Amino acid sequence: MRAVIQQVKLPDTGRIIAISDVHGNLLARLQLRDEDTLVFCGDILEKGRYSLETLRYIMRLASERRVLAVLGNCDFWQDAIYRPTPGSDEYCKRYLLADSAGWGPGLLAQMCQEAGFDMGRGMDMEEFRRVIGAAYAPEFRFLESLPHVIDTEHYVFVHGGLPEGGHEDWDGWKCMKNDNFLGQGRSFDRWVIVGHWPVTLYG
């Protein structure tokens, strides 16, 4: 899948606040002002019981303020609904029946619970996609609208990191999941703002 790159002109005033892996209450502490630009550098979902609530909150925030977002490797569920493969169906079923490594039900499981869709080992994945895709079309459209990279005059925002080579050849997945990007020893002509890799792992 080719990387989607969005060109953005940032305003000259206000703070530019970039956050990633929003598995906490940071937003409440930011005290956002009207002139601020909030950039989500991916992984707005998963690792908690409030993925659906968080997604809706960010969608609402994006309709009220200047909010930008890129896809992270934990946000990429629209393909499971719109472009499934036999492999993705199996992965999706295992994910739905698991406990997200102890974090509780993830986004799709939360959608199933809210919609009253029965998740069992014998569930029909085609029916799952039909029911959940229809019930949560606005949420999937929002995720579908997110780029892998936001390119601005002074900053590049990406979840995992920028792959090697020219941007026309970048793979979207490698933008979302690019472990230890800082440790790759590369340099750029602008600040590259990433998430994904916990700061403690760079120590």
Can you say where each PLM-predicted feature lies in the sequence?
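Short, flexible hinge/linker loops that cap or flank conserved catalytic cores
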Residues: 9-11, 32, 184-186
